[in-house]
Amino acid sequence: VLLDIELDVAQGEFVALMGPSGSGKSTLLNLIAGIDKPSSGTIEIGGVDIARLSEGELADWRANNVGFIFQFYNLLPVLSAFDNVELPLLLTGLGARQRHERVAQVLQLVGLSDRADHYPSELSGGQQQRVAIARALVTDPQLIVADEPTGDLDRTTGEEVLSLLDQLVHELGKTIVMVTHDPKAAARAGRMVHLEKGVLVDESPAH
């Protein structure tokens, strides 16, 4: 349960949500991403109060405006890296040529052009997370929500993933909201927001 949360995130900002288990981090992330609806209040993103959208409108809004990155990658094991990244585009009505060009672009961006035909089982954890980041980017969303994106990675690989997220913010102008338990990961963001028992207790610059 979240209580009287007031949080402003600027376009092109990298925000880390921190707090103990059960503090409301994932709940807040789900609300921001339009997965859950609040019982009261507003969630305004890009001038749209997504709390007022119908389920169908919300699904369309998510598909066009939000990219998701998860701790355990959530890649389909029977699909290649290329096909995993292409999945969100199958809902957009783009033709095959446009889809393939876009997938090639984002795989190049995350440094995996040479792994496009590999299956998840043939990729390291860091490579799988890069595929997941490419999938999050392929529809060119303004907002990216990341739930413990380095939680299943070793320190060095985690740093590489965080550097990539930083690149998305500073070079592409993406907005990233990231849940993490790791203070070092949170320090890579521009701002840290601390939650306890559903209450926003502190905000501070990460640097």
Where are these regions (language model features)?
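ABC family nucleotide-binding domain
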Residues: 1-195
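H-loop (His-switch) and adjacent beta-strand-loop-beta switch element
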Residues: 192-204
